[in-house]
Amino acid sequence: MTVPHTLPLDRQEQLAIDLVSAGADWIQTEGGTSANPLSPGVQGLIEKASPTLAAAHVISRAVAVPVLCASGLSAVTLPLAQAAGAAGVGVGSAINRLSDELAMVAVVRGLRDALSALNPVQI
């Protein structure tokens, strides 16, 4: 179940708790279009992902089901999602926006490498 990023964090947390109480067995955070980075480069990537990272941090501590962190993530921010408590990540637009299959493979490998660097288990 996806918790809307348009809610304040405390309401996102409560909604996640309510969804789990109603039987949800996982929760997904999102960042949507609310994150418009002001900075270029790595700092901009972190700014863009900050709404979903903040939600993953708050929600993962409030519920006992896996939390999937999605929206605006990159190879730079995937390790931050794990550190925030996410059990998994969603990176659809990072791949789907590309039209070249080789570029898609390269992005997936880069994302895998970013996660492997933090947790050196073979993926």
Task: State where each predicted segment sits.
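Alpha/beta enzyme core
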Residues: 1-69, 74-123
